[in-house]
Regions:
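Alpha-helical transmembrane segments of multi-pass small-molecule/ion transporters
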Residues: 1-298
């Protein structure tokens, strides 16, 4: 239990600092988010891929596992929306809540604290898949456009270009001169605490309200998704750390950026904001549970 607490308490502590900062300071969250998205997160990806010990097979299976989990979750939500006769905005919001995990602000720190460097490098791979879904495919879905237009959006992301750079450095054994690799590493390390602080600030600006749809979002995001990850991971033959990361990252709460997405591209922003808060708070209970399961059974 102490090992599990030592993984989740540091994460909760930094989020709490962000909540306090959001209450007592005048903080421009948008600027902090831009720094993370355009500088720190790409640096983390470049550094992670540059130093990775994972094989192409490992990387491919983790990404395939994420894609299959997302696809099944989409089907589940569409069926539930039809059975519950949900309106279009509510359906889109529930879809965003269920399918888009917070792998950046929450997933990477938890993986780092709980599973160390081996877990973090795999969590970065998972985050690449979720970023493509969150910032590329999802806007196209919410707008009712084709997936081709979604992939056009994907290639505007700095994170995608950082993937190409990181893979190129690793493939051709390119070494940055003048210890610039350390600079990239330091920038990447800054992404994790800043992401948690941003999450805390964003939570401080939202109201807590729990209704049936919010609870449904919690069940889908925090319970169904990780159980589905276990089933799909086993069917793909994933074992050890690869399977642990697939399950753990699938157990993350709803991504904070979904509020921005539904506001801009369609959906209920109010429902989305409430769901983000509820799933994030609930995840502080469910994540330790899944960490315990991973420790005992995997």
């Amino acid at each position: 239990m102490l090992v599990i607490l030592s993984a989740i308490v540091p994460v909760g502590f930094i989020i709490l600092i962000g909540v306090i900062a959001g209450k007592i300071l005048t903080v421009e969250v948008h600027s902090l988010s831009q720094i993370t998205v355009y500088i720190l997160a790409p640096a983390l990806v470049i550094d992670g891929l540059y130093r990775t010990t994972l094989s192409a097979s490992n990387i491919g299976l983790i990404l395939l596992g994420f894609a299959l989990i997302s696809l099944v979750m989409v089907i589940v939500v569409e069926i539930m929306a039809y059975c519950l006769s949900l309106d279009d905005d509510t359906r889109k919001s529930l879809m965003a809540a269920a399918v888009m995990p917070n792998n950046g602000n929450m997933g990477l720190p938890v993986a780092s604290f709980a599973l160390g460097a081996a877990g973090l490098e795999r969590a970065i791979i998972y985050m690449i898949g979720s970023s493509i879904l969150l910032f590329g495919i999802s806007p196209a879905y919410l707008l009712g456009k084709s997936f081709l237009s979604g992939f056009r959006l994907v290639f505007r992301l700095p994170l995608i270009w950082s993937i190409f750079i990181g893979i190129s450095f690793q493939t051709f054994s390119f070494h940055l001169p003048l210890q610039l690799d350390k600079s990239v590493s330091y920038l990447g390390q800054a992404a994790i605490p800043l992401a948690l602080i941003i999450l805390g600030i964003q939570l401080s600006q939202q109201k807590l309200a729990i209704g049936k749809l919010e609870l449904l979002g919690v069940c889908l995001r925090l319970l169904v998704a990780p159980l589905l990850a276990f089933a799909i991971g086993n069917s793909l033959g994933l074992t050890g750390m690869d399977l642990k990361i697939l399950i753990l990252q699938s157990a993350m709460p709803t991504a904070v950026n979904t509020v921005i997405l539904v506001t801009e591209f369609g959906g209920s922003a109010a429902l989305m904001a409430r769901t983000v808060v509820v799933t994030t708070l609930a995840s502080l209970l469910t994540i330790p549970f899944f960490l315990w399961l991973l420790k005992v059974y995997l």
